[in-house]
Amino acid sequence: MTGSSIVSLMSQSLVVFMIWILPPLIASVIVGLTIGIIQAATQIQDESLPLTVKLLVVVAVIGLFAPVLSAPLIELADQIFTEFPAMTLGY
């Protein structure tokens, strides 16, 4: 296995990571901004409210999108385990 194939696998891993992290991150940012605006308008200064709601939203988004998000992760893991014997031949 050459260095370029390892770099290719690393870049594919980063893309899969971005695919996994973006939906919960976007949902958390939107909910956090919405709750922040509501708290500023009503002058409620409770710190646990935004954290609890964001946590529930992130868990819900991961639960809803897990089947869709798992496909690239499973493909990458299959590719890595298939190519692993070729990676270790020279060592």
Curated annotation (Swiss-Prot):
Keyword Transmembrane attributed: yes
Transmembrane segments: 15-35, 55-75
PANTHER family: FLAGELLAR BIOSYNTHETIC PROTEIN FLIQ, SURFACE PRESENTATION OF ANTIGENS PROTEIN SPAQ
Keyword Transmembrane: yes
Membrane topology value: Multi-pass membrane protein
Organism for this UniProt entry: Sinorhizobium fredii (strain NBRC 101917 / NGR234)
Subcellular localization(s) per the UniProt record: Cell membrane
Any one biological process term the GO annotation gives: protein secretion
Protein name according to UniProt: Probable translocation protein y4yM
One Gene Ontology CC term in the entry: plasma membrane
Key words of the record: Cell membrane, Membrane, Plasmid, Transmembrane, Transmembrane helix, Transport
Function: Could be involved in the secretion of an unknown factor.
Cited InterPro entries: Bac_export_3, ECF_substrate-spec-like
Family listed: Belongs to the FliQ/MopD/SpaQ family.
